[in-house]
Amino acid sequence: INGVQLTLKKADNVVNKVSVSADKDAIYDKIKEFVEGYNKIVKSMQDKVKEKAFRSYEPLTDTERKALSETEVKLWDEKAKSGLLNSDNTVSNILSNVRSGLYEKVEGAGSLFELGITTGTYQNGAVLQIDEKKLKNAIAKDPQKVLDTLFKSPDDIKDHPKNSAEGKAQRANTGVFVRVMEDMSNGITAIAKQSGVGNESSILQQVKG
């Protein structure tokens, strides 16, 4: 459960006892899996900002669609949808905010970079890199601290304004991965509603999934 393995042991004439030991390999694998999924989303967003736009390809009308073959419609739609988020300030701001959020320390736990998880060069944007040795050492030393730093969730979550004192306190008590994914999900949902992309946006589905 969350990288913690429960082991039941029974000695002669002794009632069963439950010993809880951290499954360190499972914790590492969970973190690695999350980082890989997160990086995939970030790279998709970065690609969308740089994607070429074909301004001459306007959305087809119903009449125009009927005059074209299924293949022609598909190719036209791909061109029309390409570059919708090219140089989009909102997406760029989301990526910038996510990168900044990665540096924020978690109250009562630690910071992402103490665990050997970094963003590398600025050109890499918010893409994460793992120092395997440093992360495994951190897990071996204090697995609960690692889990809290990344996945901690406040006991009583409220919908406070982000910049209010309550909102800042709640954010400070939320694990880095949890709050970053919340920021990404909220930002992409806002873009989808604003641009009319809808809930079928591929990036939005990746975040929600």
Model-derived regions, located:
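Acidic, low-complexity proline/glycine-rich segments
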Residues: 1-14
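Type III/flagellar export substrates
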Residues: 11, 15-209
